[in-house]
């Protein structure tokens, strides 16, 4: 059934956003043809990426700060005009708050169906911590944009309940789970520079923001003298990891890799022994998150060590997929708790068959009804 074309908006460079890729695949399977719109990080980057549907990336003169977000809004407004005129779009899908206003504007102006997917609790994100004026502006922006929608998606029940209580919207939950697929063939450790006969802990994430646990993982190596740590991704903590490792004298056991395409990431994940998810509860967006890396580890068949947070910690305990590290506040205490959790996991961790059974219950296809149901007429 051909439903027409739908503009899908995102503020990143398209290449590494797995949730958006999966959303577009679901829309495509249901008869929609997505037209994916993102941005180019650098002027020399290609305007398109390799996908089985139309896509283009807009160039913005600013990369961060208020001027970036202002230029993004008008860049997306112009892009939606192109989606309507050149591609014949009749619906729009906004991903996160920074793309919602252009989508609401288009849906009201042209009578398009609209969908909104909040990938995080945007106004409680790390980047707004200690910035009350900037946070107040985003809250005002959110209230204004939310007038144009009556329902939305988000990533877990705690964030969904917060939006329901605040705005009275219908909020459906679609967690950041992988698509159902055959188990990935582990990447040869020799190719990655990992040791063959040592325990390798992995922390992966497209962007490692402050307090996402990368530096805590590095510090834990001081308590795990025979273990290695691999970091895959980008971001401030990713960049600082080697400096911390050198101060502790553990740099020989740290392996840092840039972010990589999803299929390559799956193979690297399958080559590790333990997956780490170590967010600190510094902001509500972290405190109530259910990171997609937990599900990536699960589908790769490796157990996890997770920080003691309300949503992620409960999931790990209830599903029996790893060990929750004891809560602590000081850097040294956190690292020690991680080390103790890793040792506990290696002594008495979940069996591979159990991980496979849990993974079978948590996959993207199980949420297709909620995803397609997010499209609605504008208010």
Predicted features, each with a name:
Residues 328-333, 346-375:
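A charged, aromatic-enriched C-terminal amphipathic alpha-helix characteristic of glycosyltransferases
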Residues 253, 269-287, 302:
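Acidic donor-binding loop of glycosyltransferase active sites
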Residues 46-48, 133, 183-195, 352:
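A short helix/loop element that forms part of the nucleotide-sugar donor recognition site in Leloir-type
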Residues 77-81, 101, 105-109, 116, ...:
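Membrane-proximal helix-turn-helix segments that form the acceptor-binding/catalytic region
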Residues 8-9, 195-221:
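Conserved donor-binding/catalytic core segment of Leloir-type glycosyltransferases
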Residues 38, 123, 139-185, 194, ...:
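Donor nucleotide-sugar binding/catalytic pocket of nucleotide-sugar-dependent glycosyltransferases
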Residues 242-267:
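Nucleotide-activated donor-binding/catalytic signature segment of Leloir-type glycosyltransferases, i.e.
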């Amino acid at each position: 059934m051909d439903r027409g074309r739908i503009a899908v908006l995102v503020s990143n460079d398209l290449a590494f956003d797995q949730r958006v890729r999966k959303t577009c695949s679901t829309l495509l399977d249901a008869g929609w043809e997505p037209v994916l719109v993102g941005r180019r990080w650098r002027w020399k980057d290609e305007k398109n990426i390799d996908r089985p549907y139309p896509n283009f990336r807009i160039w913005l003169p600013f990369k961060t700060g208020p001027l970036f977000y202002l230029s993004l809004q008008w860049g997306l407004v112009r892009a939606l005009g192109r989606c309507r005129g050149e591609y014949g779009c009749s619906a729009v899908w906004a991903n996160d708050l920074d793309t919602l206003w252009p989508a609401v504007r288009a849906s009201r102006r042209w009578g398009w169906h609209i969908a909104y997917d909040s990938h995080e609790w945007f106004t409680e994100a790390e980047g707004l911590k200690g910035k009350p004026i900037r946070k107040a502006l985003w809250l005002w922006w959110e209230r204004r944009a939310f007038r144009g929608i009556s329902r939305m998606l988000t990533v877990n029940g705690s964030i969904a309940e917060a939006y329901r209580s605040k705005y009275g919207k219908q909020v459906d939950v679609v967690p950041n789970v992988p698509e159902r697929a055959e188990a990935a063939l582990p990447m040869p450790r020799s190719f990655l520079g990992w040791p063959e006969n040592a325990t390798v802990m992995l922390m992966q994430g497209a962007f490692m923001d402050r307090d996402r646990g990368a530096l805590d993982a590095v510090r834990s190596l001081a308590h795990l003298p025979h273990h290695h740590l691999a970091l895959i991704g980008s971001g401030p903590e990713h960049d600082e990891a080697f400096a911390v490792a050198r101060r502790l004298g553990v740099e020989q056991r740290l392996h840092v890799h840039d972010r990589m395409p999803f299929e390559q990431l799956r193979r690297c994940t399958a080559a590790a022994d333990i997956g780490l998810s170590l967010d600190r509860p510094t902001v509500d967006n972290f405190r109530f998150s259910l990171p997609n890396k937990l599900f990536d580890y699960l589908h790769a068949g490796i157990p996890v060590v997770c920080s003691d947070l309300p949503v992620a910690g409960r999931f790990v305990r209830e599903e029996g997929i790893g060990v929750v590290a004891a809560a602590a506040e000081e850097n040294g205490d956190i690292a020690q708790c991680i080390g103790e959790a890793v040792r506990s996991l290696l002594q008495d961790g979940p069996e591979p068959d159990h991980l496979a059974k849990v993974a079978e219950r948590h996959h993207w296809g199980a949420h297709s009804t909620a995803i397609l149901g997010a499209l609605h007429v504008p208010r």
